[in-house]
């Protein structure tokens, strides 16, 4: 069972780092359930030729998170090949980012640069974008006739019976 099957416990203290860490935990939980049980046949679904497929959205989410990772870690992480390795690798990348941010103090956060911009665009840019794409995956699954399980993102609990 993956860490994001349920939303991890809230941090004991509120700091700048733990707030970003909690956002990443929420992303992990939502991504976990949006991609849970996704068959290859549904992953290629796209409502029209110009739209991204579910699998393409998953790859795009990986790219965005890898970009965030590169802003705080000098080493690069290779993109996994295949749908299920990509899902597992993305969840692992989210966990790495969550842990990294949870221990950062304000000074370290202030030193983060994304496209030569200070910390703030990290929230309204890539992390918000990831949430949008997770929502697109959920919507595309519903359109394809394979809706996501009914997890509870407010309480961070899995669907009944899972």
Cite the ranges covered by each PLM segment:
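Short, contiguous alpha-helical
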Residues: 2-8, 21-32, 42-80, 115-162
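Short glycine/proline-rich turn/loop motifs
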Residues: 9-13
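Second-shell loop/turn segments in exported
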Residues: 14-21, 80-84
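An acidic intrinsically disordered interaction segment
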Residues: 22-33, 90-100
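Helix-adjacent hinge/juxtasegments
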Residues: 67-100
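Long, well-ordered core segments of solenoidal/helical folds
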Residues: 98-102, 160-162
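Acidic catalytic patch
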Residues: 101-116
